[in-house]
Amino acid sequence: GMMWNNRYLKANNLPAPKEWIDMADPIYFGHTGMSAPSRSGTTHLTVETLLQGDGFVKGWGKMKSIAANFKTVTARSFGVPDGVNSGDFGVGIVIDFFGLSSIGSGFPVGFVYPTVTTLVPANIGVITNAPNEKNAKLFIDFLLTPEGQEILLDPKIRRLPVNPKTYSKAPKDFPNPFKDSSIGAAVKFDVQLSKGRYNLVNSLFDVMITYRLDDLRAAMSAIYEAEAKLGNKNNPKAKKLIAEARALVAALPITEAKANDAEFNKIFKKKRKKAKDIEKYAGTRQAEVEAEWDKFVIDNYTNAIKKAEEAIKSL
């Protein structure tokens, strides 16, 4: 979902977002943040939820429109709630317990589940040949007891219990997935689909957003300027150029069919924290594909700026 800093929003005269698309509004330019799915499993689930909820092409288009407003892509998932809590940026895309625990800890923040969301269980288990297998099983059993479930309501934890009865002891306004239809699993999450293209989706996000955030922001900033100048004017040429610029930003360097191809996904084995880390696996098929994607993305963002600037000149 989305968490926000109430003081930050008030100081910058910004409304609290309710849906994913709200975060694509130009008013949030430079006021939002998110971690990269390649650095956070929960963030990956958020991205995949958008792709499955809206469809691959439309989902990526929405994701890039949202990302264009980012002030930063944080190095770790914890960096998002930290950024919102401290007021470094106003709104962050997070897993729910980051927002709920911040509220419980007294930070001036809010949190909302957008309509397109999914519920993902947190797993617990005993590893094979565990040195303390008996105690591990006892711990799991304890977590499922009423007392163990109530621990999840602790202000510093704030996870959703699996026992419906536990919610009777939850604080006021605490989300209850068993009763509140607004936080139901709106997306029937396809785990196998997500698993099959996991590394590809992470690489694609990094190439289009993480490593090219400045370029993406520049492209959308130019488009925002053109749209603002156009306003309600009747200028077909400018409208066409702006539409073409937006299409260039939204365009993908890969089809959905290719992204779901099992054999193609096998080439994505390497992870990198920085763009230049691609040098570590230079010569591999993955490096070649990512380089092709990068050229496609840069060319499109650059041409989008040119289209937007041409639109401005025509007004």
Feature names for model-found ranges:
Residues 1-3, 31-35, 90-94, 110-113, ...:
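Structural recognition of the beta-strand scaffold that forms the well-ordered cores
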Residues 1-74, 78-85:
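Extracytoplasmic ligand-binding site segments that recognize negatively charged/polar headgroups
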Residues 3-8, 119-133, 151-152:
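A bilobed periplasmic-binding-protein/Venus flytrap-type ligand-binding module shared by bacterial periplasmic
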Residues 62-67, 104-130:
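Periplasmic-binding protein-like
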Residues 85, 90-108:
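A ligand-binding cleft/hinge motif common to bilobed small-molecule-binding domains
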Residues 127, 132-193:
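Mature extracytoplasmic/periplasmic domains
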Residues 167-237:
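C-terminal structural cap/anchor segments
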Residues 226-315:
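C-terminal non-catalytic accessory extensions
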